[in-house]
Structure formats: structure tokens, C-alpha cells
Amino acid sequence: MGINSIFPRQLEADDIVAYICREHEGTKVIVSVDQDFLQLVSSECTLYDPIRKKFFEDGNFQEQTGYQNVDEWYTAKCLIGDSSDNVPGVRGFGKKTVQKYLKDPGYILSEKEHKIFQRNADIFCLDKYEELPEEKKYYKEQLEVKVDACYKTFLKYCEEYHFKRILDKKEDWHNLFFMKSLYNKLNDITS
């Protein structure tokens, strides 16, 4: 159908997304509400949150998150923790305390605070693929498979399996297939 597919073996999907974003050149747009993907935002990678209809990019990162850059955001996440993932943060660190910490290069975490920070960094970091060279090689090979985008085959498949919602929006799928300004189309949604 013209779409590369990667079948996870040992890694979770978010680690595979991280691999694609960090290891492959070119523009990438992640469409997800998962804020953990903010750590992947770069000059080549944008996160689009379809619920909030917001883009998180290199150029607007501070405006959208309140943090100057990805490193600051990641440091804050490791200190604050994430209640939605059931990961407690360093005691006494909320958004205000984190901002003070980030502005004070002389602040040193206690040994206990540092252990919690490091544990959270290990949990939140999307680079598990680095620990598994065979997996990394496998995903690289999966992405190198050349698939021809065939819109007609895609539509035939959708008709055969009665994918009515896709068929109702053929033009949108056509634009996706041929990458006709996906970024601009998503940007129009947010305006």
C-alpha cells in the first residue's frame, strides 16, 4: 500500500518512534497526545497534539511548554515526575520550584533527590533502542524497504475491507499518500 510498517519485537512503540526521529534524516511529524514525545522535538521533528490542536516545534517550544528547550523540559519532567504514568517526582518539586532550580546553576540535588531524578530519567528516556543493537539493525532494515505508494491499491483494499470512514475522506487520504503539505493541512486545523 505504499506505507512502511515496522513490527515491534522487543521495543515499545514509543521507542521505535524515537529511533525513527533520532536516526533518520528528514522532516518528521509525530501525531500524538503523549507528551513524552516532547523530548523528540528538534529542527527536524515536530509533535502535533490533535486534541489540543497544537504544534510543538523548535521555534515555538518555549511558548507552548514554558521551558526554553527540550533539555529544560526533560529536566523538569524528571524532577516533577508524572502522575499519569504513576511516576513520583522529587519531593517538593513542582512547576514553580523547578523554574527556580533551572534558573539557579548553583543548586545541587541531594543524593536522595539525585537518585529519584536518575530513576525518572531512565523511565522517561526514549532511547531503549541504543541498548539493543540487533533491534536497531532490524528497524533500520525495515525502514530501508522501498514501498511504492499506490493510492489505487490503497482504495481497493479499503473497499474490499469496508473501511467506510477512510473512503468517506478519500481526498484527505490522497493528500497523505502524496504528502501534499501535511504540515500545512494540520496547521490549518489549528488556526
Regions picked out by a protein language model, each given a short descriptive name:
Residues 1-168, 177, 182-189:
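Extended two-metal-dependent nuclease catalytic cores across DNA- and RNA-processing enzymes
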